[in-house]
Amino acid sequence: MSAETATSPAPAAETPVAPAPATQTTPAEGAPTPAAAAPGGNTVSASLYVGELDPSVTEAMLFEIFNMIGPVASIRVCRDAVTRRSLGYAYVNYLNAADGERALEHLNYSLIKGQSCRIMWSQRDPALRKTGQGNIFIKNLDQSIDNKALHDTFAAFGDILSCKVGTDENGKSRGFAFVHYSTGEAADAAIKAVNGMLLNDKKVYVGHHVGKKERLSKVEELRAQFTNVYIKNVDLEVTDAEFEDLVKPFGPTISVALSRDEKGVSKGFGFVNYENHESARKAVDELNEKEVNGKKLYAGRAQTKSEREAELKKSHEEKRLENEAKSAGVNLYVKNLDDEWDDDRLRAEFEAFGTITSSKVMRDDSGVSRGFGFVCYSSPDEATKAVSEMNGKMIGTKPLYVALAQRKDVRRQALESQIAQRAQQRMQYGAGFPGMQGYMGQPMYGYPPMPGYGQPMPGMPPVRGPMMGYPGAPQNMMQSRPRFNPNGQPLPGGVPAYGMPPQVPYPGAPGYPVRPGGARIPAAPNANGPRNGGPSPVGAPQGLPAGSIPRGGQMPARPHEQAAPAPQAGRLDAQSLARAAPAEQKQMLGEALYPLIHETQPELAGKITGMLLEMDNAELLHLVESQPALQEKVDEALRVLAEWGKDEKPAADEGAEEPKKEEEETKEEEKKE
């Protein structure tokens, strides 16, 4: 392998820079983050796991760092399958294991975009990763101890495969850590030497790591043999002596405490610790729901705060899932309601389709209707019938939009999935040229191009020069699609694509020279025309002399021909939309929405229009008529685009260099010719 190949920058995708040897072990695509690379693998591996990465780190950034150690075979940043966001870890494959060892020695805990990375050998075998051999657990750590300080402290006892300090979402230490040694003997030596020592003036606990399943089973055993009892709803007039007399008949106690505040007033609850589990169980059975001084007591096993919070969270989640299961398929979302609609009017319009359990029109803080509401039926069949009958129905001045209600996070996830699918389609069919926005460099509304998209029609000359009125514009820029009547005159609706200037008429149109057989007549040589096969002047299609084109790049108008009017916003109504063919309705809605969106988002108008056209036609018509509703949808689309673009922008910029390079090579070839 040449040195030039080894030092070339890595592409954004997982394209190997050089072929890897047969002995190399590469991590599986989308493999989960290993807790630690377990020892015992016999295969010589040159694959490193790099964790704790900033979400914006790309393959190219990692290549620049790791290629300084030695030739890199491939790099992959693992990403979410739907959103394509970085999962915070990557795999770096070297051509030989010696380079991997040097990278592990010199780059471990180094800063990448201001964040310390964690490097260890990749272990593909999950059985070896999860054995836990040589893995120790440390708790009661000082907040100032990080991964590097932990590694330096425990490296004296043996070869460390991985060490990690547990952190919260803000990156602060949670006071515990894990260290994984290559051998069990090293782990035993570390436990013997460090357990009970002071680290930064705090006494730490060090022991063998116990798996979560084993810990939970042990906790359940301890809970089943509880001796500490919690009693609440105790009358505030009950004294300590009366409380002891209440709990002592069930067995010998270790401690009895009735909680009081700083003023000595009872808080209404207390704790009793019995000597054995049988006494505690008997106290719970006898005292729970027993009436004392007119109050029913609650008695149960004493729980820690974290345990109570976990149970409370679990109960809330179960209740939420139960409510969702009850409303699945029966709860409808109704939009485009007139301002005067109330709950009774909403129920009256929908009660013909079945039994309504609840109906509500949503209002703001001042009591003004927000234009939407919810209707819940007793069965899914009734809800389905209401959707089929009421969706798109004109009641008052607006067509209703009726659909099954969805939670906000579900709608957001569906929208992100649509954006990810469009991104994959652009990658599959070829993205637009750099700098082109919306429709200029993409097929209509973000859909994949049809076969032959961007190619000339049969009998049409290939366009080598830029389009008229757009010097230097790319050749695949979307052209207008005017509609013609049988006499060949353009209809009023046949406007160019969203404000683009009229294009040169197709070959074969009146005034275009053709042979009797229908073929185009080649143009005669012209002194002002291109020479030696060079490109035509700006705005001149091949086959026409440049002198026949007036200044400004405009074709002369034919007799009785009138220019097509510019698209006007807000001219579309429900009646005209209903008269149009289904295939043309989306086009009409797009032509009406684009200028409205272009007023506030000129650069992203094309993308946002394509996103909104996924919606129902009735809802799109409402967006055309209601500027506040349209602005709300535009803002939502901008938020989704901003979040999705955080991870995709660096990769897109790198991928955009290839079309630029090809364009430069094409220009060089034309100069040589």
From Swiss-Prot:
> Per UniProt, what is one GO molecular function of this protein?
mRNA 3'-UTR binding
Q: Tell me the Pfam families matching this sequence.
A: MLLE (PF00658), RRM_1 (PF00076)
Q: Where is the PABC domain?
A: 569-646
Q: Which residue numbers delimit the RRM domain?
A: 46-124, 134-211, 227-304, 330-407
Q: Classify the main location.
A: cytoplasm
List the SUPFAM superfamilies. PABC (PABP) domain (SSF63570), RNA-binding domain, RBD (SSF54928)
* Top-level division of the source organism's lineage: Eukaryota
Keywords, alphabetical: Cytoplasm, mRNA processing, mRNA transport, Nucleus, Repeat, RNA-binding, Translation regulation, Transport
Q: Write out the ranges of the annotated region (Disordered).
A: 1-39, 300-322, 509-572, 644-673
User: What are the GO cellular component annotations?
Assistant: cytoplasmic stress granule; cytosol; nucleus; ribonucleoprotein complex
Asked if Repeat is a keyword of the record, the answer is yes
GO process annotations (BP): mRNA processing; mRNA transport; regulation of translation
Q: Where in the cell is it found?
A: Cytoplasm; Nucleus
Mark out the compositionally biased spans (Basic and acidic residues): 304-322
Q: Which PROSITE patterns match?
A: PABC (PS51309), RRM (PS50102)
Q: Which family does it belong to?
A: Belongs to the polyadenylate-binding protein type-1 family.
| UniProt cross-references to PANTHER family, sorted A to Z | RNA BINDING PROTEIN
Q: What does this protein do?
A: Binds the poly(A) tail of mRNA. Appears to be an important mediator of the multiple roles of the poly(A) tail in mRNA biogenesis, stability and translation. In the nucleus, involved in both mRNA cleavage and polyadenylation. Is also required for efficient mRNA export to the cytoplasm. Acts in concert with a poly(A)-specific nuclease (PAN) to affect poly(A) tail shortening, which may occur concomitantly with either nucleocytoplasmic mRNA transport or translational initiation.
Tell me the protein's name.
Polyadenylate-binding protein, cytoplasmic and nuclear
Gene that encodes it: PAB1
